């Protein structure tokens, strides 16, 4: 039985002090659940709300890429300077130590390689939510092709990944791909980033 001695002060609930309502510094994420906020907090700096992401997922469409031939040698020395690493599950598992204190964004889609003129056709899910959870991913990245023939399919993949990620508290990142024949203009990027945010 609990000791009754000294428990008279246990009824002081400080009703005159309001409960702290802590805001959340990542824009648009104040309504998210605990798991989602926890993962976002690992990626974004609390003072600036910004993040430095180092992406090395190029090999999944480009094959061997100059400067990234030995990811196990070139990426780990850069980790102290970044907030988030983005790569495919295979590269992250084989080249990045799970003991590294850095957020991980896993590329979860596949797309056509650079061997095809139209790279926006033929994409799909390469890493499902179970694999993302098993890897303790802080974010899932989906390639999108705004203004290309595969736009609709890529946005469908983004929406379904966001639905699944929300269910498990894992944020989804929409990555904007600029097609070979598309101009890299401010107007294009304003349109593309707004579409992905919506």
Predicted regions and their residues:
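N-terminal amphipathic alpha-helix/helix-capping segment at the start of soluble metabolic enzymes
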Residues: 2-56, 90-103
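Alpha/beta enzyme core
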Residues: 46, 51-53, 59-114, 118-198
């Amino acid at each position: 039985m609990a000791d009754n001695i000294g428990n008279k002060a246990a009824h002081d609930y400080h009703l005159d002090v309001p409960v702290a309502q802590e805001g959340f510094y990542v824009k648009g994420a104040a309504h998210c659940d605990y798991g989602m906020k926890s993962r976002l907090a690992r990626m974004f700096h609390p003072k600036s709300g910004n993040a430095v992401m180092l992406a090395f997922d190029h090999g999944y469409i480009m094959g061997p890429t100059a400067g990234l031939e030995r990811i196990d040698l070139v990426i780990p020395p850069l980790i102290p300077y970044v907030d988030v690493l983005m790569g495919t599950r295979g590269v992250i598992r084989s080249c990045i130590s799970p003991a590294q204190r850095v957020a991980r964004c896993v590329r979860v889609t596949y797309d056509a390689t650079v061997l095809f003129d139209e790279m926006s056709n033929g994409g799909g899910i390469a890493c499902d939510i179970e694999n993302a959870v098993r890897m303790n991913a802080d974010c899932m990245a989906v390639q999108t092709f705004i203004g290309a023939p595969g736009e609709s399919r890529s946005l469908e993949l983004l929406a379904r990944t966001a639905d699944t990620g929300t269910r498990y508290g894992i944020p989804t990142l929409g990555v904007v791909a600029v097609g070979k024949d598309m101009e890299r203009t401010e107007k294009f990027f304003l349109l593309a980033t707004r579409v992905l945010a919506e």
